[in-house]
Amino acid sequence: MAKKQSILSPIIRITFTFLVLCGLVYPLIVTGIAQAVMKDNADGSLIYNDKNEVIGSKLIGQNFTDPRYFHGRVSSIEYKAEASGSNNYAPSNPDLEKRVEKSIEEWKKQNPSVPVTEVPIDLVTNSGSGLDPDISPKAASVQVERISKITNIPKETLNQLIKDQTEGAALGLFGENRVNVLKLNLELQKLMK
């Protein structure tokens, strides 16, 4: 019995020590460093309005349906962050074809002056997560005519807005040029006032 206690005692102490180190000390240190070095990222890259209220995140897409605003990618999960994911249909899957056709029909209704052949793929397909906050600059540009017509903001102004909001590839190497739809729409909203 004494031998069992002599073996269990160090096991319990080591377990408790690592529980405290890995469960409390390490997370607190990492959180402290993150808050000190990159507070914006550590807090979720939140975007605030003029009243200092959180209206979204740079990292999570939102569903914009008002024709006065730029629209983002299609989301099969309706931008619900807790259900991140996509159906990941194969290109030959009939369900994918139906969903893309539905997206194209919606596009035609909202943008009758833009031929379907000019619609970038990112406006009719969803991303792997279903939460993508960005679209390509071309996807933003093909929406300019609709927005200009509704808001009476000149096309040149809208194109410049897209150019100003375009972010390059990470480190100039990874990914594509992209436009964050929420940030773009916030700047557009300022022009509408």
From Swiss-Prot:
Disulfide bond sites: none
Annotated Gene Ontology cellular component terms: plasma membrane
Membrane topology summary: Single-pass membrane protein
Transmembrane residue ranges: 14-34
Localization (cell): Cell membrane
Pfam family, one: KdpC
Keyword entries, A-Z: ATP-binding, Cell membrane, Ion transport, Membrane, Nucleotide-binding, Potassium, Potassium transport, Transmembrane, Transmembrane helix, Transport
Superkingdom of origin organism: Bacteria
Similarity comment text for this entry: Belongs to the KdpC family.
Subunit record text: The system is composed of three essential subunits: KdpA, KdpB and KdpC.
Name this polypeptide is given: Potassium-transporting ATPase KdpC subunit
Annotated organism of origin: Bacillus cereus (strain AH187)
Record gene name: kdpC
